[in-house]
Amino acid sequence: TVDTSHEDMIHDAQMDYYGTRLATCSSDRSVKIFDVRNGGQILIADLRGHEGPVWQVAWAHPMYGNILASCSYDRKVIIWREENGTWEKSHEHAGHDSSVNSVCWAPHDYGLILACGSSDGAISLLTYTGEGQWEVKKINNAHTIGCNAVSWAPAVVPGSLIDHPSGQKPNYIKRFASGGCDNLIKLWKEEEDGQWKEEQKLEAHSDWVRDVAWAPSIGLPTSTIASCSQDGRVFIWTCDDASSNTWSPKLLHKFNDVVWHVSWSITANILAVSGGDNKVHTHSPWHGGHSLLVFTPPTREGT
Amino acid sequence: MEKMSRVTTALGGSVLTGRTMHCHLDAPANAISVCRDAAQVVVAGRSIFKIYAIEEEQFVEKLNLRVGRKPSLNLSCADVVWHQMDENLLATAATNGVVVTWNLGRPSRNKQDQLFTEHKRTVNKVCFHPTEAHVLLSGSQDGFMKCFDLRRKDSVSTFSGQSESVRDVQFSIRDYFTFASTFENGNVQLWDIRRPDRCERMFTAHNGPVFCCDWHPEDRGWLATGGRDKMVKVWDMTTHRAKEMHCVQTIASVARVKWRPECRHHLATCSMMVDHNIYVWDVRRPFVPAAMFEEHRDVTTGIAWRHPHDPSFLLSGSKDSSLCQHLFRDASQPVERANPEGLCYGLFGDLAFAAKESLVAAESGRKPYTGDRRHPIFFKRKLDPAEPFAGLASSALSVFETEPGGGGMRWFVDTAERYALAGRPLAELCDHNAKVARELGRNQVAQTWTMLRIIYCSPGLVPTANLNHSVGKGGSCGLPLMNSFNLKDMAPGLGSETRLDRSKGDARSDTVLLDSSATLITNEDNEETEGSDVPADYLLGDVEGEEDELYLLDPEHAHPEDPECVLPQEAFPLRHEIVDTPPGPEHLQDKADSPHVSGSEADVASLAPVDSSFSLLSVSHALYDSRLPPDFFGVLVRDMLHFYAEQGDVQMAVSVLIVLGERVRKDIDEQTQEHWYTSYIDLLQRFRLWNVSNEVVKLSTSRAVSCLNQASTTLHVNCSHCKRPMSSRGWVCDRCHRCASMCAVCHHVVKGLFVWCQGCSHGGHLQHIMKWLEGSSHCPAGCGHLCEYS
């Protein structure tokens, strides 16, 4: 158990790329970063800047430095950066009309791109263009009523890498998935002209989609997305045939309560699911999709 | 967004029914007030003053109080209040400083009753005494508060705040003589109505103007104040010094604050700029509003709960010229939207999980907020179902290890560091890796390595201590040695005529075969029995005579001229392209129809996912019998690699790919291989295993992958003598024909780590230069350059 000293509910906790730091964010408007190496927990930074509950945090790939994005009920997205050991606000994006619920960094191969999903139904994409400048693209009305989650597809190159001489940037197809209050999961693809287009609509949930997680493509022959919803169901979506782009859902489990989060292990062989019962269930979605372990946080009795 | 629920509440005698609804007003509203029957609402503004009946489905205009052709400034209302005891009595505060009372009981169209023109500037607020029918209080921009007795023509008393304008005045609900007033300078004053000479108490509540205040309807002495500093504060006024109990931060300045009836900790707020929404806060959860009404398109100017004992109906007027009735049930509840849980998979397979602690846990274990410590009774109170969340919210953050006792992904790191991928014969690599896997408790992987070894190493080359692995428990040295002898002998005996010739005779070889299989079976049966005596003895005796031949088959002693001796391809470094020479396709044809083939195939297939040492042994046995060429297993190995990759063990897939090299490469399509490589390299880099990652890149057969570490590796070097760029390869300068890589300190040619200054091109052994720089910052070559090393 990590003592976060947050004064209100924690909405998200994310480990960085190397698994050495943990960022948490809370209703108390703060974002905290802990060093969790060797089982320790040292508070490195307490980031204040949001004026509302902070819903989600996301670490950027370390090749861009130590960068953390956070999104909040105050309609803002803040990008924090560590410079010489101190964390500071490096950019503030205030382009949404309502609470920003989810942030997710694109695979590092694409450059520094952040997708933000908001309750105003829009998804905005922030691309770093150098010298502290960010270019904003916005997908309006991506999800009616609101967007709850965004998750990038792993970087996959059409065709073989071999066609591209080294040094030249391969032509990636950028994709991400989003889940919203319209009970849908949508897949978005960047067109050649740089515009984002809805590529696919995945329909299976009967209530708000709370989280989507695109599986890391380590060793997997197929594209896989996990989604969870207010309706208590967790679906695994697979796309076996990339050319026809048809996705088929498989019900992993039906819980009796809202399922808030799905998270893949880095090798994508285990899916962790957290539900309204305050427990974490881990599943192996492959080979039968059996439940593995259930974790229950210790009660604070006697502390 | 159709959310039209209907709520009916019975409140002793009267029944409230309604739904979320709104009606258009002719002009922007400045203030609203509800009649005590909860059935009518008055809306006042600069150019509006109307009474609406609140019906079930809609608002119905009942009375327009703004009469006369040329309405006077007296009708331009900043505030309006409906008497809570007398249904016919209203008071308004006019922007010209006049306080007007209205009597709805008057028969004429003009209901205006009394006019008090005592204030010099805009009157911001009027307030009736909660229990005294004739007492009216006003607060004005001119800094004065006045108390009127409606039975008299002018004010009874005047209170001077001794400061700038008064923004709000409110009679205490419980204390008959007390009222609070708030000021533009951030102060709150408490007055006794009988003592106009000075205030009872004064304190600074906010930074900047305090726009509003509201006494708690039940809790004596709780006063909520709202200011331009975007904060709502709850004060306990019963103590000697006003004590701040709660503080709510909103996103815009707070214009109005109203406690929610029947919900002790709830209050509604609205802002005077930027934000058009109305929020209901639980003061114990100061960061997230409990409910939010988003109907208005412009600033909300007036809010009022419809009935003093009903928590579900809220009325509001706005600058957008609309009057709304909000149902709490229909409010959007940001708390409900909020994720109460955070979940993340760490790199090492650990899970970070933050979850909301239930109220129960909070009650038993945690200290409640300081503000609540005074009222522990709260926790025992049955929670109001109308409250969207139960009390305090806090989260516990736990980090779980997914593999109890183990380090999660620790095996990955260990394996990556310890696997041998090249530089040794295949068999040794397989053995080594099997051993590594077994030591890490990954038996299936270990078995796979052993299997690979058996499949791909021609039997004659199987070094000793082989079956040791497949049997599993690392037995004595003697027995496995004998076993492998036996196998070596047995396989050629069956497989080819020429080898048969070398054995002492047909009958003899048959016996050997039988014996050895018996041995194997014995071994299987008691795999745990280390060095069981019977077969060992037997073998020792039996095979003795063949030792010479066996040595001939050993790689070291193999005669190159011997045509049947299969050269160990594994002896070469794997990255070299070697033509795979299977022991002979004719053997396959020989035995293609033998029942052993299908049997072994089935066996191998069945054991691909979870094998035991039993089946493994029988397979290897079958293999030797049938002498299948490694090619035969290509498909199988491919499936096996796919299996591991799908399991998330891309490490295994890549390691096998590298170790087997050409043997399997052709069976797996280039793209998949590339994908595995990049995935594995990615993982290695995440674990900061740079050296392993580099080795994998180097060993990879895929061009796209191997070029990964060839990016930006060019070094531009200047000759240390003539200072010109070195154009040719090597360390000899074209121009001065001297070796450029001389150490400036010891004047020897540097081999290994060479460090040099980019300014003057001089450098030398890293150690020497470092030592030199401790004493001097000038170049050791004596060129006078102040060297810089980064």
Swiss-Prot record, chain B:
Zn fingers (RING-type): where?
741-790
Top EC group: transferase
Free-text activity regulation comment from the record = The GATOR2 complex is negatively regulated by the upstream amino acid sensors CASTOR1 and SESN2, which sequester the GATOR2 complex in absence of amino acids. In the presence of abundant amino acids, GATOR2 is released from CASTOR1 and SESN2 and activated.
Q: Which GO terms describe its molecular function?
A: ubiquitin protein ligase activity; zinc ion binding
Binding-site residues, Zn(2+) 3: 757, 760, 785, 787
Q: What is the effect of changing residue 155 to D?
A: Mimics phosphorylation, leading to inhibit mTORC1 activation
Q: Where does Zn(2+) 1 bind?
A: 719, 722, 733, 736
UniProt family annotation: Belongs to the WD repeat WDR24 family.
PANTHER family to which the protein is assigned, alphabetical: GATOR COMPLEX PROTEIN WDR24
The protein's name: GATOR2 complex protein WDR24
Its source organism is Homo sapiens
Gene this protein is translated from: WDR24
